[in-house]
């Protein structure tokens, strides 16, 4: 009955929420139109009433939801308390070793009730307690232990295996203190790195040697340029002497009288070789005409 009431209240709240939203939309559209002042005032009042009703409906909806949450939490607490009461704390015994661990509250309460009911003798009490403990341990422990171990051990093993394969491949050797697995993986990582370095080293060396060989022929080329320069200088001097000889020949061929004077000048020199001053005078005079006084003498 309580569930049906909650469902009805929820449906009524949803319907009121939708109708109020539609009324707000319609009132806002009418307010935008150029109506009379009285109509605008009434629409604004309706909008205020609708907005307040929406707020009230939201509060009611939240309150009902909180009430449902409190009911569910109370039901869960009752269920957990019932489970704890129905499942007593039993003895956990290893059948191979015969070791038993139990809560002290139950072990003390059980032997206290047995001697009062059966006999006042002290010898019969320990036998009855031991029989009860053995019966309880054998019936309750064996079906419960394998179920808990099988469910707990299987799922954590899988992520641990993936974790070891993914992470320990990148562990440096400085972290490994005494773990043999860590040292085994750590030795594999540096073995791969120096192999790559050895392949890169020989490729760089021949490139340096080729650059040194290319620089040697460049030093020999400027030496050849220096040897060609002194050969050009005597050619310039020979051209100058040829120009002087051509001037002398042109001057002497034009005037036959100066040839005889030139011969006399050469003959006057004691050594037979003309002096530079005499040769220079003869080269200057060809442009001037001969005087008549020199010819008559």
UniProtKB/Swiss-Prot annotation:
InterPro entries per the UniProt record, alphabetical: G_prot (IPR000925)
Keywords linked to the UniProt accession: Disulfide bond, Glycoprotein, Host cell membrane, Host membrane, Host-virus interaction, Membrane, Secreted, Transmembrane, Transmembrane helix, Viral attachment to host cell, Viral immunoevasion, Virion, Virus entry into host cell
Cystine pairings recorded for this chain: 173-186, 176-182
Biased segments, Pro residues type: 287-297
Regions of compositional bias (Low complexity) in chain numbering: 107-139, 149-160, 233-253
Chain positions carrying an annotated carbohydrate: 70, 72, 80, 86-87, 92, 100, 103, 105, 113, 119, 135, 137-139, 144, 147, 199, 203, 219, 231, 235, 237, 251, 253, 269, 275, 282-283, 287, 294
Biased composition (Basic and acidic residues): 211-232
Polar residues composition-biased segments: 254-286
GO cellular component: extracellular region; host cell plasma membrane; membrane; virion membrane
Transmembrane spans: 38-66
Site (Cleavage): 65-66
Family note: Belongs to the pneumoviruses glycoprotein G family.
Full protein name: Major surface glycoprotein G
Organism whose genome encodes this protein: Human respiratory syncytial virus A (strain rsb6614)
């Amino acid at each position: 009955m309580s569930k049906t009431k909650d469902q009805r209240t929820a449906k009524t709240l949803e319907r009121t929420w939708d109708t109020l939203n539609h009324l707000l939309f319609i009132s806002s559209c009418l307010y935008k139109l150029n109506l009379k002042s009285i109509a605008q005032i009434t629409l604004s009042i309706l909008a205020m009433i609708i907005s307040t009703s929406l707020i009230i409906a939201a509060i009611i909806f939240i309150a009902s939801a909180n009430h449902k949450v409190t009911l569910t939490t109370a039901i869960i607490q009752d269920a957990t308390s019932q489970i704890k009461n129905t499942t007593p704390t039993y003895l956990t015994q290893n059948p191979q070793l015969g070791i038993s661990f139990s809560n002290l509250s139950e072990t003390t309460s059980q032997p206290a009730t047995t001697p009062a009911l059966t006999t006042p003798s002290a010898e019969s009490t320990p036998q009855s307690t031991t029989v009860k403990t053995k019966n309880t341990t054998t019936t309750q422990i064996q079906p419960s232990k394998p179920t808990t171990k099988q469910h707990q051990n299987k799922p954590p093993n899988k992520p641990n295996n993936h974790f070891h394969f993914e992470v320990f491949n990148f562990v440096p050797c400085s972290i490994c203190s005494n773990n043999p697995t860590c040292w085994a993986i750590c030795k594999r990582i540096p073995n791969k790195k120096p192999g790559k370095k050895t392949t890169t080293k020989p490729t760089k060396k021949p490139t340096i040697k080729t650059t040194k060989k290319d620089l040697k022929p460049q030093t020999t080329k400027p030496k050849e340029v220096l040897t060609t320069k002194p050969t050009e200088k005597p050619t310039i001097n020979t051209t100058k002497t040829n120009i002087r000889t051509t001037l002398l020949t042109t001057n002497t061929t034009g005037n036959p009288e100066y040839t005889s004077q030139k011969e006399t000048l050469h003959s006057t020199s004691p050594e037979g070789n003309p002096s530079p001053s005499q040769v220079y005078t003869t080269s200057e005079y060809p442009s001037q005409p001969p005087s008549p006084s020199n010819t008559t003498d």
